Amino acid sequence: MSNTNINVQSSTPKKSLGSSQYSLAGSSSSNLNNINNNNNNNNNNNNNSTGQENSIDDSGSSSFVNFPASEWLSKAMHKHPDILELRERTRPITQVKSYSRNKRSSKTEASHSINDTMLLKLIMQYFHEENLTTSLKKIQEETKVQFTPNEVDKDSLENLLRIGIKDTNWFGPLEDIEDADPEVETYHSYISEDSLNENGLEGEGNLIEDRYDESQISRNPDGTIKAATFNRLLLWLIGNFNGPDVNEFKKIFFLTYPSFTTAEAILNKFTQIYQLFDNIESAQVICFIRFWIEQHPTDFNEKLLAILNNFIEHQVAASHAKQLRAVINLKIENYKEARKEIKDPPEPKVPKNIFSPTLTFDDIDEEEIARQLCCIDFALYELIKPSEFLIKGWTKPQYRNKAVNLLNMMRRFNDFTKWIAASILNEQNSKGRSKLLGRFLKISEHLRANNNFHSLMAIYGGINNTHVFRTKAIRKDLSRQQQETYAELEKLFASENSFRNYRIAYKDAKPPCIPFLGIHLRDLAFVDESNPDRINNLLNLNKRRVIWRVIVNTMRYQPIPYYFLKVHQISLFLTELKTESEQPQLTLDLSSHDTVLPSSPSSK
């Protein structure tokens, strides 16, 4: 994998503060001695050089050089490494910004603020977050250091990784940049979605000055917003909250904002507008926040709720505060209880040997297998959040921890597809393979009846796998009904006209329904790559409008679940898929923009 270096612009003029380079991992006594010697040498050099902080002239008096206020803290941290060390070590508690080297993921000025044990625990925290349980267990055995999941360690790990890692999954020190100051150069702020905030929107512009600046907004021929700055967009939305064309745009904004800013930044802007403008706009801010809570209650994690509650407690008028508290209690704390069952589930078809340790795939009824697959798949599908589609976690490894639910569903598809192909090939003879293929085709009929396109495509992909399809002898033993079922699968997932048949079937499906994510992710990748994020330095809102339509279409069936009873033994059997063969499998590619889809038989 090639590494991509991203130039991080300094917020202060580049000014060399010395040449010492301290390693996070190098906390041995010899290294500390070298660090102290380097500091002494640097201090001597600074005192003997012209134009430094101070110098002593022939008369014995001291002269001072005026530095910009933005450099005062940098100078203080350089002169007092003991204070810097304390600052770094208490950062997870104080939440202050971190003083770190530009573009150096493994180096900081506080050389001994992290010891070997802390470093090991951070590595273990990474293994834990990535579900690398085997590696985590092994490192504990080798080092004799026990690991307990800790949210503070998690925050520390994220902060350290964000220092140098942008568009790369390389965890070693990045190469030096010729024009980069080797010393502490800038002040980094790590907000919750720092890696997504590449547009620098949080401090963009002045709300009062931007209020009527038409140069910051561009419109389509029909009058809808085409592009705008962050400030101008928010002001337009609030000023036109009850307008006829704003209802859809509010939905677009709150579903796509993670692609260009953060929830904290939006709430911060709302508080500023509430304080700066008149009562009418203040009331509209409250309406906007209510709309946000009602439509996207899951956006409000503990951190954002704390900010919102502080805003309500100290700045909002009593009447407005009452409205917001009511909607918070109703929507955020009780939203999981809003879904109610509307019908009784069918009686499960349980085999007689359900509790037997020798339970096999052949013992389970095809319809019940399809039902349990629906339960398994929907449990993954309903957890996916809109923001997971926006950060492209399926194509960028460094964002995978932000798209956990989406990736879980993709991995489920990969594992199930591989299991199907390997199960057929593991049969000893052609007759056994044909029989198993027939069972999978029967299951696919029930999946299609229940609109589970996720597992349906996995079955089609598994039996259409190159190695399975080459064994044409297994197809000649299929019944006419089974061959017709296979032909229907081919037709449904044919790639002609951009998977037109699937799109029609998905559009017309009556809920409950589960989409095949591969096609929808391909749509998102196409929209993202073929449209710029900005037009003349304005946010491209036409692009967000198209992205919103794709995401809403993908998530449209989340509110309505399947009402099948879960049979634990069958569900466990279908979840813990085990194969004896490691045949090449069809996958939703987690590392590229293109989704791998089955080929038609005619292309083989």
UniProtKB/Swiss-Prot annotation:
One annotated Gene Ontology cellular component of this protein: cytosol
GO BP term, pick one: positive regulation of Ras protein signal transduction
Low complexity biased stretches: 27-49
SUPFAM superfamilies registered for this protein in UniProt: Ras GEF (SSF48366)
Signal peptide, first to last residue: none
InterPro entries for this protein: LisH, Ras-like_GEF, Ras-like_Gua-exchang_fac_N, Ras_GEF_dom_sf, RASGEF_cat_dom, RASGEF_cat_dom_sf
Cell compartment(s), UniProt: Cell membrane
Phenotype reported upon loss of the gene: Display directionality defects during chemotaxis as well as defects in random motility.
Major localisation: membrane
Stretches assigned to the N-terminal Ras-GEF domain: 221-335
Summary of the function given for this chain in its UniProt record: Promotes the exchange of Ras-bound GDP by GTP. Component of the Sca1 complex, a regulator of cell motility, chemotaxis and signal relay. The Sca1 complex is recruited to the plasma membrane in a chemoattractant- and F-actin-dependent manner and is enriched at the leading edge of chemotaxing cells where it regulates F-actin dynamics and signal relay by controlling the activation of rasC and the downstream target of rapamycin complex 2 (TORC2)-Akt/protein kinase B (PKB) pathway.
Source taxon at top rank: Eukaryota
Biased composition regions of type Polar residues, renumbered to the chain: 1-26, 50-61
GO molecular function, one term: protein kinase activator activity
Start and end residues of each LisH domain: 115-147
PANTHER family listed in its UniProt record: GUANINE NUCLEOTIDE EXCHANGE FACTOR (PTHR23113), RAS GUANINE NUCLEOTIDE EXCHANGE FACTOR H (PTHR23113:SF203)
Domain Ras-GEF: 365-591
Protein name: Ras guanine nucleotide exchange factor H
Renumbered residue ranges of the record's region Disordered: 1-61
Source organism of this protein record: Dictyostelium discoideum (Social amoeba)
Keywords recorded for this protein, A-Z: Cell membrane, Guanine-nucleotide releasing factor, Membrane
